[in-house]
Regions:
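Structured alpha-helical subdomains that flank or immediately precede key functional sites
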Residues: 1-97, 115-125, 129-135
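Predominantly the structural core of cysteine protease catalytic domains
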Residues: 2-12, 83-87, 110-230, 235-271
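Acidic helix-start/capping segments at beta-turn-to-alpha-helix junctions
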Residues: 97-112
Length: 271
């Protein structure tokens, strides 16, 4: 993977943030099957039909602020994006016990013993091999294997669901409309923290430095389709720790980072 130094800055609340999602190398081929190769892509009309369904789940009405982690001053966004996707896919797949899993446990498997970021592909592969442990046991500061190996037996009972590599924007929109959890990369800077009156983050210029989980795809009251994103910085940021993203946020990142879709097990897959 294309290892890069994490982007470090002070957020609007004076906390140190490190964004460390690595870009994929040129001609990268994911080890996961592609979403586009496994599922038919929906047309924009079919996607809109799904988003307008009055019975459609609205994640913000189901999952409260306790589902919003704070990765702290570490470059562990890939681990938290993977753990958030697993926690939510598990919940919406029928295991309604409210268990929330640790991104730092996943990150510890892939950071090579230093807090210098990681690649999403590696996080998902290791999550599938080694599993997940509760965030309440393995907190954000536990980012090294010397701290997390004591959880390995327990984590092995919660191995991740299958992931699909998303290659295109139409694939991303189709997966979101079908209820998949999404793992994406965005560029984070000062604009990212500024939400407009609709709750949509500003767009920063760059190829992507922060990985997040989007747990919903929905229409705003003005008809704009948006991806609902877990910011991973606690509930003080955004609206209770979440923000909306549009296609514009991914225009510079979808070719430079590999995106993923995680099935929930109950979404179904038909227009």
């Amino acid at each position: 993977m294309s290892e890069e130094e994490p982007f470090e800055f002070i957020d609007q609340f004076g906390e140190v943030r490190r964004c460390g999602s690595w870009k994929v190398p040129e001609n990268f081929v994911s080890s996961f099957n592609t979403f586009e190769g496994e599922f038919p892509l929906w047309t924009d009309a079919q996607i809109l039909q799904a988003l307008k369904d009055p019975g459609r789940r609205v994640t913000r009405k189901v999952l409260g602020p306790e589902w919003i982690p704070n990765q702290g001053p570490y470059s562990s966004c890939n681990g938290f994006a993977a753990a958030n996707a697993y926690s939510r896919a598990r919940y919406f797949g029928g295991k309604r016990d409210g268990k929330i899993f640790s991104g730092s446990y996943v990150y510890a498997w892939v950071n090579g013993g230093r807090d210098a970021g990681s690649a999403l592909e590696d996080s998902l592969k290791e999550q599938g091999i080694h599993g997940n442990v509760l965030l309440s046991k393995c907190g954000p500061s536990m980012i090294y294997r010397s701290q997390t190996q004591k959880f390995d037996t327990e984590a092995a009972q919660e191995k991740a669901v299958n992931a699909y590599a998303v290659q295109t924007m139409q694939g991303l929109k189709t997966a979101g409309a079908a209820g998949f959890m999404l793992i994406v990369a965005i560029q984070v800077g000062r604009t990212w923290e500024r939400l407009d009156s609709r709750g949509v983050s500003g767009v920063d210029s760059g190829g992507g430095n922060h990985a997040v989980c989007c747990d919903d795809y929905l229409l705003l009251p003005d008809g704009t389709p948006v991806f609902d994103c877990v910011m991973d910085w606690g509930t003080s940021h955004g609206v209770n720790g979440k923000t909306y993203l549009t296609e514009a946020h991914f225009a510079q990142t979808i070719g430079r980072h590999q995106f993923y879709a995680i099935p929930t097990g109950q979404a179904g897959y038909s227009p």
